[in-house]
A protein has these predicted regions:
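Scaffold signal of the M16-like zinc-metallopeptidase fold and its non-catalytic homologs
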Residues: 1-3, 72, 116, 148-200, ...
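N- or domain-start disorder-to-order transition segments that initiate the globular core
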Residues: 2-41
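Extracytoplasmic
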Residues: 17-20, 26, 39-43, 62, ...
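M16/insulysin-pitrilysin zinc metalloprotease superfamily fold
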Residues: 72-76, 106-140
Length: 255
């Protein structure tokens, strides 16, 4: 039997991560843009300086609820209308809260970038945080917690953070809050956290895709550039200390 010759690997080619173009909008929003010809789906990432250690005492999880509520209605659209507008653009919008801050992610075909950027700016500029939507998100989060505690991997990760870091550090506690802290979250708490920490002057937007035929500076100025907010000094990062002494921890998980 004759086999096809084994393919040979080609010579490795040098590669370097493309350096983005840096800039800023008039409202203080830092911009990083990267033109990638052929990448017809544009990705936009906005990092908000709203870290988990900024959450008020006893309200662990409020950053997560705020992130989830950003697209649940604005001053111009209800939650259902906003979702429908995103769908018409063929866009997806997600938000996630983590220790460094809240990350808002948009993906959209380049041909519909203008409308999708307007919706993103709307969600950042004027989220409504309706009482009923916040209550629903809190209820959803409370439903998630028992499943996380029942998952051995998630339970082990929580215990690891608790063992490694001092109790006063936010990173020692569950990122999305506990049942006790999440129950305290309401629309007023979400609005207060948003007002205190979400503003363009301390945020960064990263835009990557094929910008051929697009006036990207004008698009960004007409959308994200209309987002306003007070200036603020960068939030100091807490010193992180940890106990990395070797030990074995047994976690009881009844059931």
């Amino acid at each position: 039997m004759t086999f096809h010759p084994q393919p040979q690997a080609g010579s490795p080619k040098p590669w370097a991560f493309p350096a983005p173009e840096r800039g800023a909008l008039g409202n203080g929003l830092t911009l990083l843009t990267s033109h990638r010809p052929g990448q017809q789906v544009v990705a936009v990432e906005v990092l908000l300086a709203a870290p988990l250690d900024a959450e008020p005492e006893g309200l662990d999880g409020v950053a997560t609820i705020m992130a989830r509520a950003l697209s649940e209605g604005t001053d111009q659209h209800t939650a259902e209308e906003f979702a429908a507008e995103l769908e018409r653009c063929g866009a997806t919008l997600d938000a996630h809260a983590d220790h460094p801050g809240v990350r808002v992610s948009l993906e959209v075909p380049a041909s519909r970038l203008d409308r999708a950027l307007a919706l993103l700016a709307e969600a950042l500029r004027a989220p409504a945080f309706p009482e009923d939507e916040v209550k629903r998100l809190v209820a959803n989060r409370l439903d998630e917690i028992p499943h996380e505690l029942a998952n051995p991997g998630r339970r082990a990760a929580m215990e690891l953070s608790k063992e490694l870091f001092p109790a006063e550090l936010r990173c020692s506690r569950p990122r999305q809050g506990t049942e006790e802290t999440v129950r305290r979250i309401d629309a007023a708490a979400v609005r207060a956290f948003y007002t205190a920490h979400v503003r363009p002057a301390t945020s960064t937007a990263v835009v990557v895709g094929d910008f051929t035929g697009l006036d990207l500076p004008a698009l960004l100025d007409d959308t994200l550039g209309r987002w306003t907010g007070a200036s603020a000094a960068p939030r100091p990062r807490p010193a992180i200390t940890g106990n990395d002494e070797a030990r074995v921890v047994i976690v009881d998980r009844p059931g």
